[in-house]
């Protein structure tokens, strides 16, 4: 049995300005699970990087203080890191393997517990995995 990797490497973070622009340019799929929204886009095999690249965004409009924005980003990254196997397993089992770019956007103006964020993250990842298999 293969042991799961619970890490979030630099390669898994979406840093490319071109990819970020393509992700938010429109026509890509989006799904909310309050307090999160995910925007995702399939990438071709020719694109470099990890199987799934993520971006976490917490608007300054929602949290004025950087300390709180950083706390929320940390919670979202941690929830993804602990549950990314849901999406990775679905991508590996699909007949035409591809890469994906994901952006997690925080929608609420208040903090939530780590457990609640993780529950919503699972909901989002299962939704993307189901849609990917179809």
Regions found by a protein language model. Give the residues of each.
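Positively charged, solvent-exposed patches that mediate nucleic-acid binding
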Residues: 1-134
């Amino acid at each position: 049995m293969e042991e799961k990797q619970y890490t979030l490497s630099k390669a898994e973070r979406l840093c490319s300005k071109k990819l970020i622009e393509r992700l938010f340019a429109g026509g890509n799929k989006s799904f909310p699970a309050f307090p999160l929204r995910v925007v995702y886009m399939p990438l071709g095999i020719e694109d470099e990087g990890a199987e799934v690249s993520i971006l976490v965004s917490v608007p300054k409009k929602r949290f004025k203080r950087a300390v709180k924005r950083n706390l929320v980003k940390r919670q979202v990254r941690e929830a993804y890191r602990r549950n990314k196997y849901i999406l990775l397993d679905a991508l590996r089992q699909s007949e035409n393997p591809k890469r994906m770019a994901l952006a997690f956007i925080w929608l609420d103006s208040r903090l939530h517990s780590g457990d609640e964020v993780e529950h919503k993250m699972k909901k989002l990842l299962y939704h993307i995995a189901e849609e990917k298999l179809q």
